[in-house]
Amino acid sequence: MKILIDGQTLLTAEITRGIGTYFRNCVEGILANDFSNDFYINSIPGAHLDRLSSWAREKLCLIDDPVYDIRAADRGKKYRSEQYSNSLNNDIEKRGIDLYWSPNALMDNVVLPTRQTSACQFAVTIFDLIILVMAKEYAKHWSSSALTSYEKKLELLKQDYDLFLHISRHTRSDFTRLLQIENKQHVVTPLAAGGSFRPYPFPKAPAINEYVVYTGGFDPRKNMDRALEAFAVLQKKYVADPRIQATELCLVCSLDKVAESRMLRRAERLGLSGKVRLTGFVSEAALLALYQKARCLFFPSLYEGFGLPVLEGLACGLPVASSNTSSLPEVGGDLAVYFDPYNIDEMADGLYQALQAPMDYQSRQRRYDYSRTFSWPETARATLRAFADCAGDMRPKRVA
């Protein structure tokens, strides 16, 4: 079987974010598990292919065409999309590709190609449908042209794509319910925490720093304002508890000077002066260190396609206080404390409960062991099985 992996993600900012984590781990897992199929990637030389391991790059055949440089500023979006689709379908025909896979289809900075051939199956990974689920909130933040483009992509998925890989059962449920796509293949291929995420590597835990770690941002679904309010309620409700009073809230997210100033002013108004720490963007190594020495993870997101920080926190042995929405209970299982992310008092109570959770070696190890029930190798194997099933539906049987 010949499989073509769409390489657009390599040319976008997403390569350093969650989508990029999925792309790298899934592609490398597929290549490590498969020795019978041929793999291609369409991109341009130097397109961050070095984000993949050298052995993985050696197993990929690069289909190089300037049209695949989606960053080109001299092309309008419609023209770029048409040219990309034409070149892709020509390469599919020319090389006899059996299955094309788009690992990142719905971001506004990538092209979702149309299908012009019946000789190849089209597969796509779906991370979430936030723009539909939280339409009112996102209508304020997206331009009308971006929303129109998103809607057109959804229609194209219904029309041209055969296999849908969903990163959670909840995402699959949202997708089939909202788009009413039942007569296609739907397979759940969950995410996983990276191998570096694990409890502090000594038999005895270090002295726990007095902070709660929050990973999120200024995206409306990340619920940062309510997170601050809930932390303020926690401080007021347990004013006689010296350990709670000594606990800070560590906000891990990218932010500019204006946003930083706004958050600090808001913290001051809530009586949290000196109790809120803003890290800005951090590397994976720095994030790991923050997780390992925190008292718990606070994840009050309104909606997630998966919720990787919950799994990363558990992998580091942390108690987790999480929203009870979307896919998050699916990810945290029985080991997280859940709350209604629209109810500030309930958020504060959930956070307090997580702060009381045991942090002995056995408890941390139990959280870590649970996190490892999600694994990139298994996700890669499930993806490969889905590819084989999908392509097997249309490939002619060989005559002995």
What are these regions (language model features)?
Residues M1-A400:
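Carbohydrate transferase catalytic cores enriched for Leloir-type hexosyltransferases
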